[in-house]
From Swiss-Prot:
GO molecular function: protein N-terminal-serine acetyltransferase activity; protein-N-terminal amino-acid acetyltransferase activity; protein-N-terminal-alanine acetyltransferase activity; protein-N-terminal-glutamate acetyltransferase activity
Tissue specificity note: Expressed in head and tail hypodermal cells, hypodermal seam cells, pharynx, intestine and head and tail neurons.
Record lineage: Eukaryota, Metazoa, Ecdysozoa, Nematoda, Chromadorea
Keywords: Acyltransferase, Transferase
Family assignment from sequence similarity: Belongs to the acetyltransferase family. ARD1 subfamily.
Residue ranges, annotated region (Disordered): 162-182
Protein name as annotated: N-alpha-acetyltransferase daf-31
Annotated Gene3D superfamilies: 3.40.630.30
Organism: Caenorhabditis elegans
Superkingdom of the organism of origin: Eukaryota
InterPro entries linked: Acyl_CoA_acyltransferase (IPR016181), Ard1-like (IPR045047), GNAT_dom (IPR000182)
Amino acid sequence: MNIRCARVDDLMSMQNANLMCLPENYQMKYYFYHALSWPQLSYIAEDHKGNVVGYVLAKMEEDPGEEPHGHITSLAVKRSYRRLGLANKMMDQTARAMVETYNAKYVSLHVRVSNRAALNLYKNTLKFEIVDTEPKYYADGEDAYAMRRDLAKWAEERNIEPADREAYTTAKTTDDKKKNRS
């Protein structure tokens, strides 16, 4: 197995993996948008023949006035390749790139409240926390958990150097700002 940064020529295989694994599907232009806007953030897992068996599609949220943070748009691993640590490795590579390239303080994602396997991965392996429940988030009306993983602490524990060390360490986190307003 090999984990590497996704390239434009991987996008069809990523979309195929998405169609096989998930009920939420995207048009090809959405994959291109991610690949061209944030080329460092999406990763694939490939088997020994070079076939894509999993991917993470990620982006940076660019809300003015908010601290830099990433978002996982989609994560999928084909069924026969699950429980091998591929999702964990791809998510860690994406998190590293978010910190090293964009000074991301945290990463967010949404997950179906019924997706127990994904919740277990996010909460227990990747240390995401549920921060909110968004009613009827999905097209079929199912609710989503909004989840978040602190990247500042994660990066510090792994000696990962942010894009701009001074800005990274002097910027207050959203939680610090909320505490100061209280």
